[in-house]
Amino acid sequence: MRMTDIQRCEVRPGLLVEWSLDPAAVRAATGLPDDSRPPAYIQESHIRTARSVREGGLFVPTWLGTAFDIPGRVDLDALQEALRGWMLRHETLRSGFRWAGDDMRRFTLDAADVSLRRETIGEFRDADVLVRYLQDRFDVVADALRWPNFLYTAVVREDGASVYMAFDHSNVDAYSVQRIPAEIHELYAAGARGIRPEREPAGSYVDFCRTERTSADEVDGTDAVVERWREFIDRCDGRLPNFPVDLGLKPGGRLPRQKLMREMLVDAEDAAAFEAYCRPFGGSLVGVLAATSLIVHEIGGRPVYRTVVPFHTRRNSRWLESVGWYVGGAPVEIHTARAPDFDSLLRTVSTQLRANRSLARMPLARVLRLLGSDFRPTSPDLYSIVSFVDARGIPGSERWTELKAYGLLRVSYGDQVCAWVTRLHEGLQFASRYPDTDVAHKNLRLYVERLREVIVSVARSQQPGGSSGRASSAQITLP
């Protein structure tokens, strides 16, 4: 679905209703014994980072969410039961953490104790006022350092309702939130007809956390994966990679506010042609990374583009429907200055991804611990990313535009560029959080315009009238 923020997801006035975990369930959780299943390394890193940044005097909301419509007069009882039924499928949403000294201990609420409290907040006639209220509420409730850390809302009108749901990132990734609209619609439609659908619980992310952590803890500092990360970080001057263009930031300065840039890059026709061109090398991800390496070389002049590429870790079908944070990262180095043409860049990226993708299975937080690296976080983002996701296969994706379905990002503070390129049925969409400086805006604007130009040039090089069946230096100028 299209990635955006709460300000740009077509919020309309109406009656606001909220659902939160019932206070009785919250009280029950306080007396629960420890759950022996540990946090995933990525969860622990996220929560410790939030604590470190908070202790530094800055509150940095980092929640994710989704927005979508339910057409027609809405049955709030059926919607509440749909939300509860969906939540019961995903164990991580009733599992949280508490501190025991400096250790994180998990607790998990029994499914039988899960209930939601509905509260009618009131009528909002001004969309801007409603947006500010929703953002403020999500900031407070969907917070890494509290539990429960999610909130469900609906803005009800005569002709339907808009649902807005927010979660701390420790429980969800982009794929998780993209699956939500279809699941809620299915459960709601059944409930509105008086049918209680029998759906088995999805694979538990809490179980995955234990499995992944057990495997990661068997690795020591002599492992080849750790050594490859060591070499990569050494070539990054002892740091994880930033987006290699000038962002107008002063060394040691305060964490800057961020802005959002989001737009469609190309339509479905050009997206399909770009994908077809890149398919022999591995597909659109390879093409986007190759184009990025070319563009940042043009802007920043660096001969090598180093980045950490996000990959999902749902390698077993058991986890395909599961809500959780199933993401790892693989180090990639692209020697842009050595490439005589775009095809050479594609081959370089393809080779790098094949060689390094398996490294994403090892949690980076575990690697850093084994390296003895003191990455005391001062920013919610340890490194910059350029992510690519093909979302067309997600259930319900063909209705996302009709249902005004969006994936929501909280844009607050950060010194990194985090960019997402999403393949939708209607084309390629770009969204990015970036530091709010004039220099960063200028350079990111230049990056996006050049990314569009490269994609279009590649796509149209093989269309009738194109000068060549392959994109070479005749179509795309390499420095």
Which residues does each PLM region occupy?
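Active-site-proximal acidic secondary-structure segment that organizes catalysis
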Residues: 2-10, 124-127, 131, 138-140, ...
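Gly/Ser/Thr-rich phosphate-binding loops and adjoining beta-strand/alpha-helix segments
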Residues: 24-31, 36, 58-78, 144-165, ...
